[in-house]
Each structure stands twice: as structure tokens, then as C-alpha cells.
Amino acid sequence: MTESITWPFPWPQSAIAQYTAYRVNTPPQIDGRLDEACWQQAPRSPRFADLITGQPAIHDTRAAVLWDDDYLYVGYWVEEPFVEATLTERDALIYEDNDVELFVAGQDAYYELEINAFGTIYEVFFIWEEAFDRAGYAQQPAFDRSQPGVRPFDGVGFQPHPRGRRIGYWHWDFPGLHSAVHVDGTINNNQDRDRGWTVELALPWHGFRALAAPDGRALPPRPGDVWRMDFSRFNQYKAAPPAQDSGGWAWSPHGVWDSHVPELFIQVCFSTESV
């Protein structure tokens, strides 16, 4: 049988990106600058491409991943000639600004983080509804479905997903998250030309317990373990026609206007090679 028959998702399985995450010998300072040697030596992603078509984006965006026994580290380099942001309240709808996004998937749940050039964070924890009881989430007070900020979610452009509906926890905050943004220019001042902004994240492994529990994955990962992650950028502007710019760019495209497809997330392998 061909992949088009057996693979029910809108981007070829063979085209999903893979990445090797190196260990850090000295943890980076989370200041958003990405100027430590470990970030300079870490393999960077290719230039992000359009989320739907895979065509080159008008501005350069790249990401890299590092790790140690305590944290998962993620860095973004964002070319932006006119850096802009408006939202300052935590869990505001950051995708209505220009942002970068991180998704991390477990077997039965996934985590979403968005951040703008002000460093404002938006987070959601999603659980597949069909796994809610089976995976043990129903027994955890933190995932009581009667709480404020809990509601069903059916995805965005890829519907219906083969696994069905998710339960979203919009009040959930990643335990111990550290984040920082550095703007190389002047934010919200379009009288000059900026170079862009960089984002630095440190997510402690203990914060992934709810994600890791259903399949018993090791925290921190064992060398050779593979996790699914997604890295993207969304803009309130688009390249002029004839460019086919959806306004969403990703390390590994999805073929549809929807980041919420864990099966299309990048395969990140944790290496013992260090930087």
C-alpha cells in the first residue's frame, strides 16, 4: 500500500524533519541572547518554511535544542526588520501578535507555548479525550475538567483528527519554566530597521511529568530517546503575491493550517555528544 493510503495526515511521513539534540556541559544563562558557546555550536534548524506549502519564508527563522539532566533548552533566532508586539498579559492570545511557538508531545497529551517579543507567554496543556481515563488523567486533581479554563478543542485546519477531540487546560502553567527574549533593535518603533529578536527557553524535566507518565518515558531522557516537538512562527503580515505565504512558518511544514498535529512534529533524538 502507498503512503497516501496508509498515512492519514496532510504532510508526507518521509518528509518530517529529524534533529539530534546535544548535551550542554555548562548550562546557558537564560537571558534571551543565545550568545554562549553552546548555542553557537548547537546544530540549527533549516530556515523555517511556510506551514502549509513548505515554500521559503520571506524572513529567516531558525531554532535549536539542547539538554542536560535538569532542563530542555530551546533557542529561536528570528529575523524581523520591524519588531512589534502588543500583548503583555500572561495567557493573552499571543498568536494575535507576531510570535514563536513550541509544542512538545507525549503519548496521550501535548504542551503548547507561545511567546512574543515582549516575552509574554501563552500556554496550554492538551489531553486526548479518548485517553483521559485510560492514561490516568481523570484521577489527577490538576486535570479536573470542571475547573475554569478547561474546554474541548477540535483542532484548527485539520479536522477531524483521527484521535478525535482534545481537552485543553488554558490555566495550566509549566512548572519551573524559564524564558527570556532579547530584541536586536527597537520594539514598536518603525522609524528604524531592526535586526530581529531571539528567544531562550529552559523547561525543567520535572515539569514534563504529566506528559511523560502515560508511556513511562524517562525524565531526563535516556541517550537515544526520541521525543516529538514542533517549532513555528506566526506573523500578522504576509509576503506579497505571488508568494503563497500563509503567515505561519515552521521548521517542518504540516501541509495544513494547523500546528496541533503531533504526528507531524519533528523527531528530536537526545544525544550524548556535548557542546
Predicted feature locations:
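Structural preference for beta-rich elements and adjacent junctions enriched in aromatics
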Residues: 1-275
